[in-house]
């Protein structure tokens, strides 16, 4: 019987965190919840702690940690707070597996800590690779960590690629990576209709249940753009070897085309518990509570090219990848500000790519040298984005 694995979940109250706990609960003799973290959702984390009894609970916000401490009186769970505490539970000697699912740039440092500590990292935080792909992959190698992508698309690619990490796609006989995208809720919308999109409409994804930020990113196709950058770092794939294919049914999660003409695809119902279970159990397969795929019910599979004129965020992401250096970090920071502004009704849906492009144009692109440099670039890009938003509001 496999050894009991201690699991730290960074971002436990989000969609990925909750799905991870669901999978873990199906295998009580195999996994134990070691640490749970959240930003500020006290009630939600308290409920999870009462249910799963972790050794540690971490709130990024110190005030929230004090409230959590009160709610967990009498429980053996130790409550910590702050970024240093997130890094501590990510790198703790007794933690075997780290689910890195904090949304946004806040997840970067804890993921780096887990990498240097040699953990099995289930990576669901896009920004770690988008902002600091070069540095993070170096940390994974130096720390001897095991990296398993949890994004459904990258997990699919991982499953149909050769088992050893390649220094170049050609070494595995690979011609290109085909990254599938649902196309989001506005795939068939006109320019005029996109101008009038509301946050409520954008949050209604046709296939996936996700958090608000990633749902908006899916609607703008920025989510796919960020995944292109991730795929570059995960699989040593240059931009011209990654093609985005719109596939509205979200049944094929991605494909790899080989030089002999073969195309290998990973298929399944759109449920994040599948890639999570794959990451937890790898190289074994675990039951995840996911229904079997009914091909007769699916009926048909459609494919089309993405329209970067209506959805320029995808083009901006490819451009940032080709520019390299700090460009992806600038793209990411500007996008986070833009999405937040849209959700709060401060800018329109089509203002999101306008804001991002304005910030990319305004800032100098530098070679990446350190995490501290990237954090400074992130802050500067956010400042530029906020300034643009305020000027547009005048």
Curated annotation (Swiss-Prot):
Cofactor: Mg(2+); Mn(2+)
NCBIfam families registered for this protein in UniProt: Dxr, PRK05447.1-1, PRK12464.1
Organism: Methylobacillus flagellatus (strain ATCC 51484 / DSM 6875 / VKM B-1610 / KT)
Family, as annotated: Belongs to the DXR family.
Lineage of origin: Bacteria, Pseudomonadati, Pseudomonadota, Betaproteobacteria, Nitrosomonadales
UniProt cross-references to PANTHER family, sorted A to Z: 1-DEOXY-D-XYLULOSE 5-PHOSPHATE REDUCTOISOMERASE, 1-DEOXY-D-XYLULOSE 5-PHOSPHATE REDUCTOISOMERASE, CHLOROPLASTIC
UniProt function note: Catalyzes the NADPH-dependent rearrangement and reduction of 1-deoxy-D-xylulose-5-phosphate (DXP) to 2-C-methyl-D-erythritol 4-phosphate (MEP).
Entry's Gene Ontology molecular function annotations: 1-deoxy-D-xylulose-5-phosphate reductoisomerase activity; manganese ion binding; NADPH binding
Source organism superkingdom: Bacteria
Cited InterPro entries: DXP_reductoisomerase, DXP_reductoisomerase_C, DXP_reductoisomerase_N, DXPR_C, DXPR_C_sf, NAD(P)-bd_dom_sf
EC number: 1.1.1.267
Enzyme class: oxidoreductase
Keyword set, alphabetical order: Isoprene biosynthesis, Manganese, Metal-binding, NADP, Oxidoreductase
The gene coding this protein: dxr
Biological or metabolic pathway of the protein: Isoprenoid biosynthesis; isopentenyl diphosphate biosynthesis via DXP pathway; isopentenyl diphosphate from 1-deoxy-D-xylulose 5-phosphate: step 1/6
Full protein name: 1-deoxy-D-xylulose 5-phosphate reductoisomerase
Residues where NADPH binds: 13-16, 125, 127, 211
Gene Ontology process terms (BP): isopentenyl diphosphate biosynthetic process, methylerythritol 4-phosphate pathway involved in terpenoid biosynthetic process
List of residues binding Mn(2+): 151, 153, 227
UniProt: 1-deoxy-D-xylulose 5-phosphate binding residues: 126, 152-153, 182, 205, 218, 223-224, 227
């Amino acid at each position: 019987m496999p050894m009991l694995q201690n699991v730290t979940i960074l971002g436990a109250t989000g969609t990925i965190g909750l799905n991870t706990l669901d999978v873990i609960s199906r295998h009580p003799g195999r996994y134990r919840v070691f640490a749970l973290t959240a930003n500020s959702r006290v009630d939600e984390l308290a409920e999870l702690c009462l249910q799963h009894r972790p050794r540690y609970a971490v709130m990024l916000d110190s005030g929230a940690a004090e409230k959590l401490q009160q709610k967990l009186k009498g429980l053996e769970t130790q409550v910590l707070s702050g970024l240093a505490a997130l890094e501590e539970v990510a790198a703790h000697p007794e933690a075997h597996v780290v689910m890195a699912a904090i949304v946004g740039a806040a997840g970067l440092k804890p993921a780096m800590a887990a990498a240097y500590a040699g953990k099995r990292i289930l990576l669901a935080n896009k920004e770690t690779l988008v902002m600091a792909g070069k540095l993070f992959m170096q940390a994974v190698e130096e720390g001897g960590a095991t990296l398993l992508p949890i994004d459904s698309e990258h997990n699919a690619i991982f499953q149909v690629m050769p088992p050893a990490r390649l220094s170049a796609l050609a070494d595995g006989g690979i011609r290109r990576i085909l990254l599938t995208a649902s196309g989001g809720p506005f795939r068939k919308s006109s320019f005029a209709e996109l101008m009038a999109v509301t946050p409520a409409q954008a949050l209604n994804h046709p296939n996936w249940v996700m958090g608000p930020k990633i749902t908006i990113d899916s609607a703008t196709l920025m989510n796919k753009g960020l995944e292109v950058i991730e795929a570059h770092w995960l699989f040593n794939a240059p931009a011209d070897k990654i093609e985005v294919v719109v596939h509205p049914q979200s049944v094929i999660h991605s494909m790899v085309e080989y030089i002999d003409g073969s195309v290998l695809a990973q298929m399944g119902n759109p449920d994040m518990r599948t890639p999570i279970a794959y990451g937890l159990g790898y190289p074994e397969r675990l039951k995840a509570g996911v229904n079997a795929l009914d091909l007769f019910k699916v009926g048909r599979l459609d494919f089309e090219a993405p329209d970067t004129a209506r959805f320029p965020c995808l083009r901006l992401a490819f451009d940032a990848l080709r520019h390299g250096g700090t460009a992806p970090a600038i793209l990411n920071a500007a996008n986070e500000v833009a999405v937040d502004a849209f959700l709060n009704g401060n800018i329109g849906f089509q203002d999101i790519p306008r804001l991002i492009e304005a910030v990319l144009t305004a800032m100098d692109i530098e070679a990446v040298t350190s995490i501290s440099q990237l954090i400074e670039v992130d802050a500067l890009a956010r400042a530029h984005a906020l300034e643009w938003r305020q000027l547009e509001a005048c």
